[in-house]
Amino acid sequence: MKNTNVIRSAYDALAESYNRWIDHKPHNAYYDRPNTLKLLDDVGGKSILDAGCGPGKYAEILMSKGASVTGFDFSPEMIKHAKERNKNKGTFFVHDFSTPLTMIADQSFDFVLCALALHYVEDWNDTLREFHRVLKDQGQLIISIEHPFFEYTYFKSTDYFKIEAVKCTWKGFGFPVEINSYRRSLHECIKPLTENGFYIDKLVEPKPVRAFEALDPKHYKELNEFPAFLCIRAVRK
């Protein structure tokens, strides 16, 4: 990732408040997680790689359902919180998406989960090839990303088809933090999957669950009219 250090610094700065808010922050707790988790089949007894695990909330949920979880994130502070949250359960380590997962053997996992993280990677191809390598035959890759149509509108882009470095300021974690990521077209979300050994099994334009409304009625209404995220289940060929 060209912006790795910038993104890492932002998430290191956010880590404490992000971890504190993640259980009930509406876009995470009542929009992303319920819709993304629906794409995972029964995880009891299964092995899951949580790629871009943040403070380990997904890992906490999945391990409570009987899964074995290994998580990585490029933010050392996020990994510290993931370990603290999950105590002695699971395995967590610092790793950059843009480098190979040399510490993981071929066909090690039943699932790879990558929730709201791939949009920090400019070129998905190497990352998806690694996900394909570490998945078992017919293993599933579950991803959630910012919806390309939402991003195109939000960032007021002029060339929809361009993979474009973008940035915005997050203000929902107690203090403003500039977040850098990459916007891309729907085609550029699907093509790297189908060209790197996956087929698309399910694609969801999610709506928030009802608990979102009491906490943020404005965005609840907006998200029921136009999606901000996109959830995809892809299967290893």
Question: Where are the model-predicted features located?
Answer:
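A short glycine-rich, Lys/Arg-flanked "PGG" loop and its adjoining helix->strand segment in the class I
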Residues: 125-140
